[in-house]
Amino acid sequence: MFKTLALAALFLAAAGAAHAQSLDEMAGQMVVVGFQGDGVEDAGVVALQAQIAAEEIGGVIYLRTNVASLPAVRAINAALAEAAPGPLPFIMLDQEGGQVQRLTPSVGFAATPSARDVARQGLDAATALYADLGQRLAAQGFNVNFGPVVDLNLNPDNPVIARFGRAYGRDAATVAGFAAAFIAGHHAAGMGTALKHFPGHGSSLEDSHDGFVDVTDVWSPAELDPYRTLIAEGLADMVMVAHIYHADYAGGEAELPASLSPEWIDGVLRGDLGFDGVVISDDMEMGAIRSRFSLRETVLRAVLAGNDILLFSNTAAYHPELGSEIHAILVAEAEADPAFAARIEESYARILALKQRLGLAG
């Protein structure tokens, strides 16, 4: 109860702060992009610093190609933080373990087991392992790890979850227990986390990285149970929304993915599950999105659906000024539509509240 009240107080304070910020500044906090380069003087890193300084982006995401060495990573992250005139940027990565690790033993970062292997070791081992992982990531200058995966391992032939051992199990209570250990370990290090892949990718037959994924006939409401548990316990910093399609939650629109669906985000996640934290899209350059929507349509639909942070890996066709372009789309639409501007203000308040909790904003 006290944790919930504290979070509510932070959100109210952040909402008040939103009124003191310009539309440009608020919109910028919603943009997270990837980059090219693995050194602090590389052009892609310099471009990020400029966009952070101009308050056009609020965070960055690392891929493995951005990691040359741990000292280089620390130098880049320090430079990105120093560029910020206001709240510090989210510096994010996927370090789940197993197949999904951006920092690897090849650069001197000890490997983390997959979720499947962690579950085999038991909850006590998981608690110690994730506490260590959180500390080691924070020491490199990261402040958000995109995990835990709370998908249920329902389809043994699933090409994106089961195939790589990314789920803790089939049972929602088991998954929620290991996810809570992941979150606690990162929180102890001052890091944020993101539950993924809402509303559940474990039953799918395809991989949304590659293209359209329809889960209408295979998805189960039980896939929401880990979210329900972790949200009720106040452990959900962010929820990452997947690009999967369910005909019953698409407002009658063919092939509208969850990441662009108000029924999933505003209806189920915020309404039914009561989540009032930060909603972040999965990578908006995955095939399921890129093949169907223009950049402008993607950005506008994502905000109207209820996403607070728009994540672009910037890998489909690298553009060093992508963050600036997304920011310009947001600002132009907000200037033309007061309702859209109100959405930006709401998202800014949630983002700022999380950054305050993580020590990234005063």
Language-model segments: residues:
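N-terminal hydrophobic targeting/anchoring segments and the immediately downstream early-domain regions
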Residues: 19-105, 311-312, 353
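Glycine-rich, aromatic-flanked loop segments that form ligand/cofactor-binding clefts
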Residues: 84-110, 130-153, 175-199
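Mid-to-C-terminal alpha-helical segments outside catalytic/metal-binding sites
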Residues: 329, 335-362
